[in-house]
Regions:
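Conserved lysine of the Walker
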Residues: 189
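Post-Walker A alpha-helix
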Residues: 192-193
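A noncatalytic interaction/capping subdomain that flanks phosphate/NTP-handling catalytic cores
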Residues: 2-185, 198-204, 209-350
Length: 350
């Protein structure tokens, strides 16, 4: 969205000199103090969103920021009674139309920084569930970049620190029994999740699952409203053909984002109760489902925890509770075979 006529950006102003202050006093002129660090930028637009069901308050001076948040989170409703995460997003003027570089993320104790350049960055305090984001108009115009690196990363960082344990896994369910599909990048989590959904399973998420703290029976939530595929998935799913291939400022691998809307013949759910964990390996000599060592599963889950030191024990306890389920490795080549083998696992327990 382009800047509207009502969106007036307040430029940084240097402090007044002594002479300017004297002149204003002598002539009884109104004084407008300088604000070189934009500390008084008005954030006069506000909306509440519920990504993955958690409340997030967004305050900003830009309608385009709210549009971006609405695009990513507009489908979600409040599911979890938590104190709202607070994002304050200030947008500044610039003359560029170039997308900023990929941010560099660093964390120490309860502070997280996400810095693209001197004008585009976020600072998050996990202990207070608050983030301040500064972005240029050029960054916000590149909506996919802005959503992914600033809105989603800060909000989900707060969620995964205090409210849930983030797991690099897809999630699908059959007969109300959820399966986490785990594995390295490229193992096929998204394609197998989507193939299961087309075979009548319930789709929860493609590769970002969150094990919710304080909920019974290993409750996982995820973004059931979209899936992000590698371009090579066009050969597997015709509905991906012709869609834009996105690459976020050179970060990561190119992807195709597919919205999954209600009524498009795929059953979705925002949550599932996990009964099985399955680690995926593709391009194998022999297709089979075999037991997977839990100690390796524990290390896989532990290595992605990003939280304050005093929150670590809560995450480790959640992971150990999750690992009480049966854990397997699915070695496969054919999506059809993999879907049928997972169905057998749910129906027969082996």
């Amino acid at each position: 969205m382009e800047q509207t006529e009502h969106e007036e950006r307040t430029p940084a102003k240097e402090l007044l000199t002594v002479e300017q202050l004297k002149r204003a006093w002598l002539w009884s002129e109104p004084v407008e103090f300088g604000d070189p660090i934009l500390a008084h930028t008005r954030l006069d637009r506000h909306a509440m969103f519920y990504p993955l069901g958690f409340p997030v308050s967004v305050m900003t001076n830009s309608d385009a920021v709210l549009d971006a948040a609405r695009e990513g989170w507009g489908w979600f409703t409040c599911r979890f009674d938590r104190e709202p995460i607070r994002l304050k997003v200030a947008v500044t003027e610039d003359n560029s139309r170039v997308c900023p570089p990929t941010p560099v993320c660093r964390m120490r104790d309860h502070m997280v920084t996400n810095i693209a350049d001197s004008e585009n960055f976020a600072v998050t305090d996990l202990s207070s569930q608050f983030s301040t984001i500064w972005a240029t108009e050029a960054a916000v115009r590149h909506r996919d970049y802005f959503r992914y690196f600033f809105l989603e990363s800060t909000a989900m960082g707060c969620v995964s620190s205090a409210h849930a344990t983030a797991i690099h896994a897809g999630c699908v369910a059959l007969d109300d029994e959820g399966i986490l599909l785990c594995g390295d990048s490229g193992a096929g989590k998204t394609t197998l999740s989507y193939a299961c959904a087309h075979a009548g399973w319930t789709y929860v998420t493609d590769d970002g699952s969150y094990l919710v703290h304080g909920e019974a029976d290993r409750l996982v939530t995820g973004n059931c409203h979209q899936a992000r595929f590698r371009p090579s998935a066009e050969a597997l799913f015709p509905q991906l053909r012709g869609r834009e291939v996105m690459r976020r400022a050179g970060a990561g691998k190119p992807s195709i984002e597919l919205p999954i809307k209600p009524g498009n013949a795929i059953r979705t759910s925002a949550t599932a109760n996990v009964r099985y964990m399955v680690f995926l390996e593709r391009n194998v000599h022999k297709e089979e489902l075999t037991p997977f060592p839990r100690v390796v599963g524990r290390m896989y889950l532990w290595q992605t925890i990003r939280c304050m030191p005093y929150e670590t024990s809560r995450h480790l306890k959640a992971i150990d509770a999750l690992l009480e389920v049966k854990t397997f490795e699915l070695r496969y080549n054919s999506l059809e075979w993999a879907v049928e083998r997972l169905k057998q696992l749910v129906r027969e327990g082996r």
